[in-house]
Amino acid sequence: MSDVFELENEIELESDEVIMENENVEEIVDAPIPFSMTTNNGVERGKFRSLTLINWNGFFARTFDLDELVTTLSGGNGAGKSTTMAGFVTALIPDLTLLHFRNTTEAGSTGGSRDKGLHGKLRPGVCYAVLDTINSRHQRILVGVRLQQIAGRDKKVDLKTFSIQGVELSQNPTALFTETVGERQARVLNLNELKDKIENIGAQFKQYHSITDYHGMMFDLGIIPKRLRSASDRSKFYKLIEASLYGGISSAITRSLRDYLLPENLGVRKAFQDMESALRENRMTLEAIKVTQSDRDLFKHLITETTNYVASDYMRNANERRGNIEAALESRREWYKAKAEQNLSQHRLVDLSREAAELAENERTLEVDHQSAVDHLNLVLNALRHQEKITRYQEDIAELTERLEEQKMVVEDANDALEESQAQFEQTEIEIDAVRAQLADYQKALDAQQTRALQYQQAIAALEKAKTLCGLADLSVKNVEDYHAEFEAHAESLTETVLELEHKMSISEAAKSQFDKAYQLVCKIAGEMPRSAAWESAKELLREYPSQKLQAQQTPQLRTKLHELEQRYAQQQSAVKLLNDFNQRTNLSLQTAEELEDYHAEQEALIEDISAGLSEQVENRSTLRQKRENLTALYDENARKAPAWLTAQAALERLEQQSGETFEHSQDVMNFMQSQLVKERELTMQRDQLEQKRLQLDEQISRLSQPDGSEDPRLNMLAERFGGVLLSELYDDVTIEDAPYFSALYGPSRHAIVVRDLNAVREQLAQLEDCPDDLYLIEGDPTAFDDSVLSAQELELGVVVQVSDRELRYSRFPEIPLFGSAAREKRLEELQIERDEVAEQHAQIAFDVQKYQRLHEHFSQFVGLHLALAFQPNPEALMSEINRERNEIDRELNQFNNGEQQLRIQLDNAKEKLQLLNKLIPQLNVLADEDLIDRIEECREQLDIAEQDEYFIRQYGVTLSQLEPIANSLQSDPENYEGLKNELTQAIERQKQVQQRVFALADVVQRKPHFGYEDAGQAETSELNEKLRQRLEQMQAQRDTQREQVRQKQSQFAEYNRVLIQLQSSYDSKYQLLNELIGEISDLGVRADDGAEERARIRRDELHQQLSTSRQRRSYVEKQLTLIESEADNLNRLIRKTERDYKTQRELVVAAKVSWCVVLRLSRNSDMEKRLNRRELAYLSADELRSMSDKALGALRTAVADNEYLRDSLRVSEDSRKPENKVRFFIAVYQHLRERIRQDIIKTDDPIDAIEQMEIELSRLTAELTGREKKLAISSESVANIMRKTIQREQNRIRMLNQGLQNIAFGQVKSVRLVVNIRDTHAMLLDALSGQQNEYQDLFNDNRITFSEAMAKLYQRINPHIDMGQRTAQTIGEELLDYRNYLELEVEVFRGADGWLRAESGALSTGEAIGTGMSILLMVVQSWEEESRRIRGKDIVPCRLLFLDEAARLDGKSISTLFELCERLDMQLLIAAPENISPEKGTTYKLVRKIAGNQEHVHVVGLRGFGATE
């Protein structure tokens, strides 16, 4: 596309219309606006002169000259105001990631279109947006960006930044970027053409390939207020411009106000970063040392594991070889021993077989006898049980007999009582009937007279009845009482007679009962007989009863005697059997007691001799065993000591190799250690002296390395505080030749501070807290300072200075001048050379000290672990001597065992014979008793008789005892008993008749008064009737009582009779059972005496014991036979096995000998036998050695995984059939390590010594770097102090900023201020850092974490409620090292009656928000300038410009306030406003977009403000 356009279609470059709207309006078309430079502390602030837009939509080549205060763009919608501002912003921040012109894209969108609103503002082809600036140095700089649309759907724009310097002020920017090709045509130059054009006019053109370089240039030349190092800085700057452009309070800025207002403390942060970097580097070096140490440990590990791997296998093979030889010898011994045992077992088999046959025969005989004894015992037990039942039944029968007699008497008494009660009851009934008859008679009388008459008649009837009964014809009322007394006396006499007869009758009955009882007892014993023969029979029985009783009492003695005789007979039979057995076993024929006693004496003497020999043998054997046990204990003790002694010998040998000495005694070791301590102390003193010297040199180097030459860092702070410069900094470029002069010229004041005004500084001196003891201040201009302030005269060796009228100072030229950087650098070079020499000497001596310390450590370990054993005798030599002695003792013990075995066999035989004799000798008298059988028969006959009497007494003893006291009653039979009984009956009958007569007479006597009623005796009829009634009632009550008594006596008689019947029935049944039991015991045919059971049991137990003993012996013999037979098979197998094992072991020994010879040859030829033959391993088991070898093999596989040669060698060595390959691997490892030794550093060929020297050197380096790390470390308290000072400084700065905001007013807002506070959580962190809490020091003393991580962990510890998210501790710690994170910033406004409020858009009107937001932005820009002042040139004050779009939202008063603010703060402002805005000050451009045909352009007219003055 052609870059040529018709000028008439775009803009008239030379004849723009000028409209004069006021007399004071001045035409400004195509003429630069008069520009005035304001000063800032004597330095003029840079200004933006103009904005040039080339080939933008509506602007082909338009330059907007910018007012020094306010430039207003006025026009309607679409006039191009936003496009103009967009060109300014694009030239200022050419970053497509940030540019976003929202009012030309989607409203309310955060993303916008893909071109960010820029693509549509450009015309096709090359476009430019250029800013023309003039900085504080009066340099004209044109900075801009070349824009070009990129064809495609994405509507992308390509940007390239550039700058132009050296262009004259008269040169119009438009003419630079265009070329006139005709009278009314011009062409836009591309970038290369522009570059050529600029170079042709003698200016400088520079293109930038990064936005950072572009902004760096703009900062250095004073165009932007802040160095934009990163995208974050550019984003902040763009957000500030955007907030200014669209007005209001930007939440993006207020939310992160700290990042905008508070400067980043780069110095402190860099110091922390440098410190942590140095610590990190130091720790990396330490880690590298650890890696080297791990390599050294790897080599050491390789040597150790290789030695364990090969030496354990070497010693295991040696132990196995020795074990195989011993096993072969042991197998041969077992082979011979098994053959001997086989011969012995065959002899035992024959003997035991013969004994087993004898025991079987004897056992059969004993089984028959035992079964007979068991049967006999069962019969005896049955007889005893029957006898017990018989005895029990006899006792029961005797008891029942007594009870029957007693019960019979009780029944007879009850019967008599019952009959008497019945008679009394009948008599009472008769009397009741008589009384009732009288009452009936009385009742028949109708009145009392009749009653009396009746009574009289009854009395007459009673009198007649009495006469009749008594046979008294002369009985009358007068003599009735006499007769009554007479008959009553007769009745009493008859009663006495009856009682006498009853007494006689009872006596007769007793005699009759005794006779009957005795007769029954006699019949029970002797059977039925006449009553007359009972006395003779009873007499005969009682005569024989005492002898039978005595004979029965002698039955137990007879039984005992018989039992003793039978036992004696059994003993006799047993003794005969023992004698036969003894003769059979001893092959003798001893019969008499004398022969047996003589043989017994001989055996006792033989036993004593054999026992004495055995005792001597046992004592000798015990002595030998004790000696052998002592030797074994000594051997075990030496075996336990041997590994430690061998280890001690190896350690001693290593010490001798390391020290080059030979030690014969422990005292030699102690003396050598003492001498080494003296040498170590001397070298340590030399090392410490060199260390002190090196520290001094480091301190001098550090002091001289200060960039300004100040030796005290406090001077820098004071110079900054006073606004001065250090004198040493002014003379920093002094040559080496002039350095001595100036050093002597200023003398002690060579470290003075040059200030502009001493009076201003003098006021601050009283407030100084931390300063040097002597502080020199010199008044002068730091930019033009010379030595004219002093009056001096140079001499040959020094300088004389006139201090005052009365004071001179003479200073000699220093030998080593330090005034000026050249002198310091020369001195630094000398000090560094000297320091290197001292460091080298220190390193060498430190190495020697480490070497001596390591050697002393080895000696100390040796003294603590091995000194007690190292110089003792060789335990293995002692063990071999002990083994030889033990073998001798074992041979002697074997001989003793053989002899003892023979003696014990003889002793056992003699004891066996003596035991049999001891059983026989006590029974010699039994053997001599020949009439024993006759005595047994005689005793048995006596016992039979006694048992018969005992049985008779047992059966009839109770009966005879009952018969004995009443036997005399049998002498006379009581026959007159019946006559006496008849006489008693007659007497009782007479008594009854007399009593009836007495009763009749008594009735008459009672009725005697009735005889007086013969005529009219009727008065007492009623009384008599009443008496009769009472009499009747009494008689009835008596009758009831007697009836009850009769009933009771009948019941009692029935109960007694029932008991009698039960007793009689029980007596009959038991008597029958007793007879049956007597018959059964007779059928058993055994005697059931007291000792029968015991004798039967003893007999059975004896036979059972003999049978059990015989069976046990037979079982034992059979087991022994089975065992011998099985042992015979086992012995045959054992003989074959031991023979086979012996041959196998012998073959193994022969086969292993070849491989072992190869191993020995390799180890001896390579001088490795001493390392492999570790005797202490010989005392470990094969499993332990194999486990050691396997563990070492696993470690070696890992260790040599990266070494192909060693890996292959190790793989070959794993073949257990070829142990020589392990030795070859051992040699290969040592050869590999020898090749790795650096001979220029380590002067040894032994890898172990090389590792030792490496360890010493690495320990020295580790100690040195650890000390350096301690120096680099920073304390938490110092960090807290730095943070507090920085925060205090920034708080003061914010306070100063607030002073500039006090008079700002927009609408109801009367003032604006910033509120800064320290966060509570971070205040706690500062307190914890500066406090004395020891619980937090563990974090800062931990070398495993950085200081930043320690800060983060401390923050988390004191604020556990805060969620840190996914951020690392290092990230959090770095944030905590930034003081800005400790502060909270808020903007407050003073609005009307509400007072101070938080500045938020919702609480303010639009104009108030715009004004407040502009105030905040001005504060941010001012803060940025202050922040960057230290890193910007001192002669540069940056440009200051802000934007405001849609200014119609501000009222006129606010616009005036804004203009006043710009004037007071020396700030330029670019405003876009509708056409109705016409500010009184500044410059206004009226923009009108015109369309001609298919093309459009913006018509621009510039106006000077109404209030402007020349």
Swiss-Prot record:
Gene3D superfamilies: 1.20.58.850, 3.40.1140.10, Immunoglobulin FC, subunit C (1.20.5.420), MukB, hinge domain (3.30.70.3500). GO terms for biological process: cell division; chromosome condensation; chromosome segregation; DNA replication. InterPro entries: MukB, MukB/SMC, MukB_hinge, MukB_hinge_sf, MukB_N_dom, P-loop_NTPase. Residues 6-30, 346-506, 553-611, 673-706, 821-846, 876-1064, 1094-1149, 1249-1304 form a coiled coil. Transmembrane segments: none annotated. The keyword Transmembrane does not apply. Residues 707-824 are annotated as: Flexible hinge. ATP binds at residues 75-82. GO terms for cellular component: cytoplasm; nucleoid. One of its GO terms (molecular function) is ATP binding. Keywords: ATP-binding, Cell cycle, Cell division, Chromosome partition, Coiled coil, Cytoplasm, DNA condensation, DNA-binding, Nucleotide-binding. Its main location: cytoplasm. Belongs to the SMC family. MukB subfamily. NCBIfam families: PRK04863.1. PANTHER family: CHROMOSOME PARTITION PROTEIN MUKB, DUF4476 DOMAIN-CONTAINING PROTEIN. The hinge domain, which separates the large intramolecular coiled coil regions, allows the homodimerization, forming a V-shaped homodimer. Plays a central role in chromosome condensation, segregation and cell cycle progression. Functions as a homodimer, which is essential for chromosome partition. Involved in negative DNA supercoiling in vivo, and by this means organize and compact chromosomes. May achieve or facilitate chromosome segregation by condensation DNA from both sides of a centrally located replisome during cell division. Homodimerization via its hinge domain. Binds to DNA via its C-terminal region. Interacts, and probably forms a ternary complex, with MukE and MukF via its C-terminal region. The complex formation is stimulated by calcium or magnesium. Interacts with tubulin-related protein FtsZ. This is Chromosome partition protein MukB. It comes from Haemophilus influenzae (strain PittGG). The gene is mukB.
